[in-house]
Amino acid sequence: MAKGYWVSVYPAISDPERLTAYGELAGPAVQAGGGRVLSLLPSRGGRVVAHEAGIPERVVLVEFDSFEQAVAAYESEAYQKALVALPDGFERDFRIIEGND
């Protein structure tokens, strides 16, 4: 079965405190949904090289055992509560993708 992934790119972070509040709620929701954070750059000391229209501000990659599990985690009550913590006008490019078998 192909794995599922959350891919998030944050073009700019205007309110770091609210993003931290979101993270405190989102982390447990992701874990409860079976997700594993593979990358949280650059905040965990990793490196990012952005090419073309790429933005190096913040990139998050979360792995799930299946695409369906990734969708269910996003739709979960716990994660929806985390989304409410994001600042007004917050911008991110978020998608759920299915990996190759």
Where are these regions (language model features)?
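A short linear hydrophobic-aromatic micro-motif
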Residues: R36-S39, A82-L83, R92-R95
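C-terminal structural segments of small proteins and small subunits
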Residues: A70-E91
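Short S/T/G/P-rich N-terminal loop/turn motif that feeds into the first structured element of a domain
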Residues: M1-R58, F64-V71, E75, E98-D101
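C-terminal end-helix/capping segment
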Residues: P87-D101
